Amino acid sequence: DSEDEGVATVSCAGGLRFGLTRPITRSKKEGMLLHLEATGLLGGHSGTDINKEHQNANLLMARMINHLFHNTDALLVDFNGGTKDNAIPRETSATLFYSDEVAAKNAENLALALSADFSSEICPYEPAFQFLVSTENGTADVISAEDGKAFITAMCLAPNGVQFRNMNLDGFTVTSLNLGIAATDETSASLVFAPRSSVATLMSALKEKLCLLAETFGFEVSMHGEYPGWSFAEVSPIRDVFVQSYKELFHDDLKIEAIHAGLECGPVSYTHLTLPTKA
């Protein structure tokens, strides 16, 4: 299966939308607000671009806030990153609360120092990246320390990116996941992932890992829109015949391709197991 002449697609990924939601409590406080924004990242599609190591804005922000949690008396006010589970988030914003100006200024300096480290790490291949930091006086409905820490720690420990490759296919991505959405509202904090795999058992293992993360940090799990993958067959007589026939007919080599995105071949191979779909 392929839309391009001279290309045979022989594997595709299955996937689903995997959500984690946790209740949070808030209380109104007056003090200093530290505004954080990660922006300018390349982003991309969580299937076709996940192997390019594009940075995830949600995870950079979680790393920043975790650093501030460990070194200052910060409380989380809000977190907003990503709009689609299957898109690598390019920008994320968050706000932290501090009781006084001295604490906020110290946190601002720490944030600026870590943002400089971020730039050193990723700017060679994320040239437009910026991390913006600012403070202001204000009143906010602040998330409790326990709830904020659970939300940020879960993000820091969550698996993300390429999880398994097929080295017989030049390192083709077999299994991955993307933290596409991380957000808080008045009563809850949510993480939404897009797991993908062309191998059903690896997908099951990935879902179990996310369920363990949810159990550890008090999240409820929801799964929607699951569709099966089409695994690559290391040995395939039908593929061998097809490659040879193409060579004889067109006097050119057929390109064999596996993709890390969904195709109709996934459901077809799943529902018609007797068909010779193991190309």
Predicted feature residues:
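C-terminal structural cap/anchor segments
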Residues: 199-238
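Conserved small/polar residues in nucleotide/adenosyl-binding loops
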Residues: 271-277
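Active-site-adjacent substrate-binding region
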Residues: 63-80, 224, 232-268
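Generic hydrophobic alpha-helical scaffold/packing signal
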Residues: 108, 180, 194, 211, ...
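A general structural signal for well-ordered alpha-helical packing
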Residues: 108, 148-152, 176, 203-214, ...
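Short glycine/threonine-rich loop-to-helix capping motif typified by GTGT followed
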Residues: 85-93, 140-143, 231-243, 267-270
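Generic recognition of stable, solvent-exposed alpha-helical segments in well-folded globular domains
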Residues: 56-60, 106, 205, 237, ...
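Midchain, well-structured core segments that form catalytic/ion-binding scaffolds
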Residues: 1-196
